[in-house]
Amino acid sequence: MDTLTHVLVLPEALERLDSPSIIIPRTANTSEEVVPYAHLTDLTQSLQHDLATLGISVGSKVAIVLPNGLAFVTVLLATIRQRAISAPIHPNSTREECKQIFSLMTPDLVAVMPSEASPAAAAVLAAQDLGLPVASCHRYPQSGRLSFCLALKLVNRGDETSNPSPCMVYSRDHVLAEDKVLELFTSGTTGAPKSVQLTHTNILVAMRIITSAHKITFKDRSFLITPLFHIIGIAGSLLPTLFTGGCAVIPASLPATFWQDCQDYSITWYHAVPTLHHLLLSFPMPKGGVPATLRFIRSGGSDMSLDLFNRLQKLGVPLLEVYGMTETAPAIFCNPFPVTETSTAIKRHPGQYPIPDAVDVMILPPERAPGLEPNGDLDGIENTEPVARLTKELGVKGEICLRGKNIMAGYTNNPAANREAFLPNGFFRTGDLGVIKPRQYLALIGRVKEIINKGGEKISPAEIEHVARLHDQVNDAACFRISDEIYGEVIGLAITAKSAITITAVKKHMRHHVVMFKVPDKVLLVQEIPYNRTGKPRRTLLSEMYDRGELA
């Protein structure tokens, strides 16, 4: 890969390669599919023409409601080539969740699979509610060099008053580094998702950090088992593989034969959140043990317990942890791949990462406090001049603040969130607690935010509370985090009821309104919800009370 490539468009040199870019493993109903780079480029260009025909151009937004697979990859790349913005959406989102996100981003097109294009599909219903056009990504057999092609077929025109005209098809030379590429949505403490837009430059900074730290080359094969609607799936796994000329193996779902598949497909690395690592360790190994082709395994997205860390270390494969956020581009803090497997390699510690040259890191200690306890209640500890407290001093605990070309410009159309997230000197407040260690390592020690991190899925307590209060028998609700050995954190929900109500009824209500991973794991009936002096529910206190057994 040309390390000076300034845009996320497949280098033209790769168009002539017959080496595989994507492999879709066989399933019970389908055969294995190997897609060379030449074929991937042709598929991408074909879909780019379809997008142009549908009126997609510079700055247009395409909501990609597709599962992991070839269709997702090609629609993503085609949108990038057309200088438009890709907005990946969880394919299992409910109608209400899709409608909320579509209202926030106003997509010019919603892309779905043919099976998802039925009038009853959640994304289609949400698009119809808002008058948005929907296109399904169809596969057609053909003769010649390519055995099949992909095409976007309009299945719902949306608002009848809109009839977009065909647009220019852009070449690679037209694409600019400042073009926006991705729009993703993060959970906010107010409950409403916040829109994050990233440019080519934002993502390329992260990709260069990743490929350099992990020494990823065209010889590598990644096993992509993380969702592509997450930043780590797209920019932390898929794109680093493709832009080094490697091969991404993308299963339709997580196979129980994972380790055998790693051996069969000569996988050299994979990424998983700690929850998924727990599950993978329960899967059977091939007769020869851990596949010999594995160079490293990678983890990120949530905290890793020391027990899991030690169990993964026993596999005998280098374990590389990464840390980043949607707002900062993914995995900007990477454990480097060891030069050797001997004692010269750096000893690993969970939650510690070298600070890259491309990212400026400072710590914001709290006012009137010598240290900050992880997940502590921060009410009233901030002052009006946090910039003066920023420090690079070793050993000082506080909020991690970052600045660099990888950082988003700001939350889209959300000045209030931007005032809260950015300091006057441009540093972004991550909401994570850390400390700078000797040798310029960053150690994570906790979180300021109340966001719940369930196995890498970020959940806003305010969103869960809002949905719970929609039940006509719920008087009040407070959502809080519960520590969990497998997921790291799970969702607790304390409610006060207007009259008799069952926990089963509350969970059924929640399942109707939110995607499954947001349904509370524990629902507790309480006499009163504790609030602080400013009227905010004391979620941290509820977590502490639960830990002490006071909310059983």
Curated annotation (Swiss-Prot):
Q: Which InterPro entries match?
A: AMP-bd_C (IPR025110), AMP-bd_C_sf (IPR045851), AMP-dep_synth/lig_dom (IPR000873), ANL_N_sf (IPR042099), Pcs60-like (IPR045310)
Q: What class of enzyme is it?
A: ligase
Q: Where is this region: AMP-binding?
A: 463-536
Species: Gibberella moniliformis (strain M3125 / FGSC 7600)
- Tell me the keywords, alphabetical order: ATP-binding, Ligase, Nucleotide-binding
Q: Which gene encodes it?
A: FUM10
Biological or metabolic pathway of the protein: Mycotoxin biosynthesis
Q: Name one GO molecular function term.
A: ATP binding
Q: What is the name listed in the Swiss-Prot or TrEMBL entry for this protein?
A: Acyl-CoA synthetase FUM10
Superkingdom assignment: Eukaryota
